Amino acid sequence: MAISRLIIENFRNLAAVDLEFDHGFNFLVGNNGSGKTSLLESIFYLGHGRSFKSSVSTRIITYDKPYFTLHGRIWEQQHEWSVGLQKQRKEGLTLVKINGEDGNKISDLAHLLPMQMITPEGLTLLNGGPSYRRAFLDWGLFHHRPNFHSAWSALNRLLKQRNAALQQTYDYTDLQVWDVELSKLAHQVSLWRTDYAEALRPEIEQTCRLFLPELDIQVSFHQGWDKNTDYGDLLRENFARDKHIGYTVSGPQKADFRFKANGFPVEDVLSRGQLKLLMCALRLAQGEHLMVQKNRSCIFLIDDFASELDETKRGLLAERLRQSHSQVFVTAITAEQLKQMQPENHRTFSVNNGMISL
């Protein structure tokens, strides 16, 4: 999987950009504020339909312009696709095209472009709330199980309906229609998450032994309620509590994927550098699992490669990325910070005030 060409129009300070990328490593070098992270953000947006920096997409559109447009040429296993996304300022409309055809969804783009993002802010995967770790698992299931996305969407829709109904009813029988289907979906999604977490665990632990040999990293999945309890029974038994609180307390929406180091929560005992290495290990293990199981490679996006890592650890990460045979985009302030990451096939772009050159 690789993006061979990217055309950008009106995306932050990138007014008009047309770039051809290496299928291996691509280095984006420039001072803070030069536009290198914006370029990384545009690639992420093309694959996710959202930004990793801003929750308000219309703010990404260049000032006084009506829209931004991203167009990419995608290559995978001798096949090529043309993909495009336009975000309009008026009404915030998003238009998606694949091979020139309208009517596609953002999820169609996401399926075509499996990406792993590594940023300094990405430590929330480890020291943030459980929602970040559920998203980590669900990303994998989205790419491994074709019917996961529809089941996950239906589950979230039913939870919203149930929570709204809790505000209006005093009789549990009014919720039974939702709870029968909700229980089925909850068990299915939780089973998929459990199986995926267990399949991923050996690869995570193996990568952690390489990156953090001084630590014993343990991985465990918690589905969001007692695994020995039927979820339908739990919903009925907890009706009064859920009604009092105003939302459904237990369930797959409370699941967590937890990590310990030498028996203690990693967020309590690891340094920021160790947390970053663990986060990198998780992303790499997940990408490698996709390759092994589905013969599909990820695109890795790495912002501020040198942050929190010493030269030795940067070398370890660089070598593991080279072994993955993935397309990699890396930002850095100076080329010197990338000296450990100099594979045979690479391309370096200089970024200065929204202007990009080889």
UniProtKB/Swiss-Prot annotation:
Highest taxon of source: Bacteria
InterPro entries: DNA-binding_RecF, DNA-binding_RecF_CS, P-loop_NTPase, RecF/RecN/SMC_N, RecF_2
Compartment(s) of residence: Cytoplasm
Residues noted as binding ATP in the record, renumbered to the chain: G30, N31, N32, G33, S34, G35, K36, T37
Gene Ontology cellular-component annotations: cytoplasm
One biological process term in Gene Ontology: DNA replication
GO molecular function, one term: ATP binding
Keywords: ATP-binding, Cytoplasm, DNA damage, DNA repair, DNA replication, DNA-binding, Nucleotide-binding, SOS response
Acetylation as UniProt keyword: no
Function: The RecF protein is involved in DNA metabolism; it is required for DNA replication and normal SOS inducibility. RecF binds preferentially to single-stranded, linear DNA. It also seems to bind ATP.
PANTHER family attached to this UniProt entry: DNA REPLICATION AND REPAIR PROTEIN RECF
Family, as annotated: Belongs to the RecF family.
HAMAP family: RecF
Protein name: DNA replication and repair protein RecF
Lineage: Bacteria, Pseudomonadati, Pseudomonadota, Gammaproteobacteria, Pasteurellales
